Amino acid sequence: MNQQTELKDSSNESNPTRFGLPRQAIKEIQDALALYPEVEKAILYGSRATGTFKPESDIDLTLIGENLTHNHLLGIMFDLDDLLLPWMIDLSLLDTIDNPGLREHIGRVGQTLYER
């Protein structure tokens, strides 16, 4: 069963969440990730996680999953691109990030956007 990040309740679907993204956009991203059983968790980091985003800020996501490969990453990237969202999505696999500063940043400010 999927557990998805609880978002602010709002009667207007276009109201941004605390990540500065409409509820519908987050749901579409979560639904795309749910198509891949290898994705155990998706962590949002960067300006959208810290609350310092601008309307045009990208969406920084790193994926966690024991069996995730670069081929999965490519498929997910294509599926997210097909959503035609107005933001660039910077997608990575946490296990392949070599930059210790970036890993520390993700650990410190990362917010769970999706969890299987």
Predicted regions and their residues:
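Catalytic core of pol beta-like nucleotidyltransferases
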Residues: 1-41, 50-55, 66-116
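Glycine-rich beta-strand-to-loop/alpha-helix junction loops that act as flexible
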Residues: 45-47
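Short beta-strand->loop micro-motif that forms the acidic, two-metal-ion catalytic signature
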Residues: 60-63
